[in-house]
Design a protein with these regions (language model features):
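Conserved N-terminal alpha-helix of the aminotransferase class I/II PLP-enzyme fold
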Residues: 13-61, 83-88, 94
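Conserved C-terminal alpha-helix-loop-beta "cap" of PLP-dependent enzymes
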Residues: 74-76, 268-341
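PLP-dependent aminotransferase-class I/II
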Residues: 99-146, 151-158
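Hydrophobic beta-strand scaffold residues
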Residues: 102-103, 170-172, 281, 309-310
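Active-site C-terminal subdomain of aminotransferase-like
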Residues: 135-136, 140-145, 150, 188-277, ...
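Catalytic PLP-binding core of fold-type I/II PLP enzymes
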Residues: 151-183
Length: 341
């Protein structure tokens, strides 16, 4: 069975797995105080050109989102996100479970617009009863978005400017950051991203690691007592070496960026195949997620040979499905899918 339904179906990149094997019998202290975690943090700071950044390795994406948002907000505040943002629609209420509301504004192909954000905050404070409602206390975006689209440098800078004006932090979800940075259309580098937000995370789970995300506080220092707060969210591994070793490997010799390029190369090949077969795209995306409108009978036929992801109903006879590539996708996989299509 071919795997095109998501970008976390496989285990770890062989180099990451080998690093885990090579260090397996080393006794190391726990909870992220080991030498590999310290080395990984330093490599990440160097890659971000942010020597003073506070870096923490958490177990997964939901935990990273829930933990960071909770750390940023007062009890009476919520986080502003596009209505299609991951925390708004695909986190099973994890943010709300932590006591914070997700405040949604319009999304356009997965992205919020700076002017909508400014208008939302302006209208909030124009309301004479605003103290009786949930305050906008942080802003959430992702790179890439839930729909595989990208913020340009100008778009992200405009959102950041609103956040700075309103004195609220900007948080960038980077679950698929390797794939975003590798896209031809991306005009943001990792060091530039560190300058365009207050905190972001570098995705590992979807980008070559077995698990783990690296949270980087770059435009601000981490709030007080981060470790107990991370632990309260179940995001702190006792065997912190597991994420430390993986991110040490990912940020050695440019592996993280190589992983991104591999996924984008196969995504481009996949896009060409889908176009050649005459399929209609729900929207055009430059990253590793491709969204196609399939006749329902075609979807059923393809699923006999390849795993693809249901996204949404398009009409009574068509469905929007997602095809994903990852670091593990090969040209042979693309050729095999082409034969199925």
């Amino acid at each position: 069975m071919l795997a095109f339904n998501n970008d976390y179906s496989h285990g770890a990149h062989p180099a990451v797995l080998q690093a885990l094997v090579d260090t397996n019998m080393e006794p190391q202290p726990g909870y992220g105080t080991d030498a590999h975690t310290e080395r990984a943090k330093q490599l990440i700071r160097e890659a971000c050109q942010a020597p003073d950044a506070d870096v923490f390795l958490l177990v997964g994406g939901t935990q990273a989102n829930a933990t960071v948002i909770d750390m940023l907000l007062a009890p009476y505040e919520g986080v502003v996100a596009a209505e299609t943002g991951h925390v708004a629609c695909h986190e099973a209420g994890a943010i709300e479970f932590g006591g914070h509301k997700v405040l949604t504004i319009p999304g356009y192909e997965g992205k919020m617009h700076a002017e909508d954000l400014e208008n939302y905050i302006h209208v909030f404070y124009e309301n004479e009863s605003y103290e009786h409602t949930v305050f906008p206390g942080a802003v959430y975006v992702s790179l890439s978005t839930e729909y595989g689209t990208l913020y340009s440098k100008a778009e992200l800078a405009a959102i950041h400017a609103v956040c700075q004006k309103r004195e609220i932090p900007l948080f960038v979800d980077g679950a698929r950051l390797a794939y975003a940075l590798a896209a031809d259309e991306c005009d943001i580098t990792l060091p530039e991203l560190a300058q365009l937000c207050d905190v972001f995370y570098i995705g590992g789970t979807k980008c070559g690691a077995l698990c783990g995300e690296a949270v980087v506080f770059c435009g601000m220092h981490a709030p007080a007592h981060p470790i107990p707060r991370i632990k309260q969210h179940g995001a702190l591994l006792a065997k912190g070496r597991l994420t430390g070793v993986q991110f040490e490997a990912l940020f050695t010799d440019g592996l993280y960026f190589e992983i991104g390029r591999q996924a984008i190369q196969t995504a481009q090949a996949l896009r060409r195949v889908l176009h050649e077969r005459g399929y209609q795209f729900f929207l055009e995306t430059p990253t590793n997620q491709q969204f196609v409108i399939l006749p329902n009978e075609d979807m059923a036929r393809i699923r006999e040979h390849a795993a693809i992801e249901y996204w949404k109903k398009y009409d009574d006879t068509h469905t929007v499905v997602r095809f994903c590539t990852s670091w593990a996708t090969t040209q042979e996989d693309i050729d095999a899918l082409a034969a199925v299509l």
